[in-house]
Amino acid sequence: MDNIKRVILKLSGEALAKKEGGYNDELIENIANQVKTIVDKGTDVGVVIGGGNYWRGRSNDNIDRTKADQIGMLATIMNCIYVSEIFRSQGLKTNILTPFECGSMTKLFSKDRANKYFEKGMVVFFAGGTGHPYFSTDTGIVLRAIELDADAILLAKAIDGVYDSDPKINPKAKKYDKISITDVVDKHLGVIDMTASV
């Protein structure tokens, strides 16, 4: 990580949840401590959190897709508020930016504002995805990484790697030890939103 000056971390909402519901505070504290080690070495860290622990709107045919995605955006904001508070409790300075106004809970995203927070040594949480329906938080993280000249994107999902099919559905799914983003796209592996991967 010595040559990486800025990284954007994507955390799956599902990965942060306990099986019985709620948040896995021990896991989040562990992540916070790992992030603190990186920040203390001078690396800027941005965080995007999915909303899957609250909402999987695409699985509900009774709700309009736009409305379902808006609910998902709100779920990411709730996750960022919670996780940023756990990060603060572990000695990190944080701030939350969203692509739309949220009153006093967050600040409106701008590249200048994010860079100002990074200069102050803050972990910057990017909530609300892109602010538009039909785009996942995977797309949101790529967008923020491009806008902010990030050196790397790290994905922490609710699964331990990339498989040739969904291991939750197919117990014989083959795990890849190494795979390029080109192969992920060509094989339609679904580990990341296709819009984000291209």
Predicted segments, located by residue:
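Hydrophobic anchor at the start of a short beta-strand
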Residues: 45, 93-94, 153
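Glycine/small-residue-rich loop that forms an oxyanion/phosphate-binding "nest" at active or ligand-binding sites
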Residues: 60-106
